[in-house]
Amino acid sequence: MVMKRITLDELRQLAKAANGKINKIYLHWTAGNYHQFFGDYHLNIDNDGAIITTTDDLAEHKSHTWRRNSRAIGICMCCCADAVAYADGGVDFGSVPPTAMQIDSMAKVVAVLCEELGLDITADVVMTHAEAADLDDYGPATTCERWDLWKLPDKPGDGLLKPGGDVIRGKAIWWHNNW
């Protein structure tokens, strides 16, 4: 397994090579620590926003999202050890919360991938694990088994917790329009 740091330009080249082979992007966190990378995801994003790839082929099958791995790229933020979701909808990101640099980097990664793969930055194409899990009855709306990126702070916006997919997709659209 490859495990190396890459730039957005290098990611752009990997995405060009995978064009026509990918139609979904799933966003995760590891529920682990900063600097702890996992081969289940194509891309890991560290606390400083660094992008770590685990493959030279983004079309490689990886086991990141239950029953949703074919023709899909899995991206994770290395964070959220000890995170807890509460019944009232509150969240505690644990001892290793997502950083603003991770969130922004994930948005840039999504923008690059969607541009090079010819994908729209919509909730049908770019989905958090929480959003996918809700569709398959194991997310925050049901068992809360998987709630990755269910909510994220909207920074530099108002700083309030908002649906994580909306935060990342919104930033990705901004990056796509403002390179």
Question: Which residue ranges define each predicted feature?
Answer:
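Structural preference for beta-strand elements that scaffold enzyme active sites
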Residues: 24, 72-74, 125-127
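N-terminal catalytic cores of peptidoglycan-degrading enzymes
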Residues: 1-69, 177
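Acidic glycine-/aspartate-rich tracts in secreted/extracellular proteins
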Residues: 32, 80-82, 131-135
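Short, well-structured alpha-helical interface segments that form or flank functional binding sites
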Residues: 38, 70, 101, 105
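Short coil-to-beta-strand
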Residues: 67-86
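Basic/polar, cationic surfaces and motifs that engage anionic cell-wall
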Residues: 1-19, 86-179
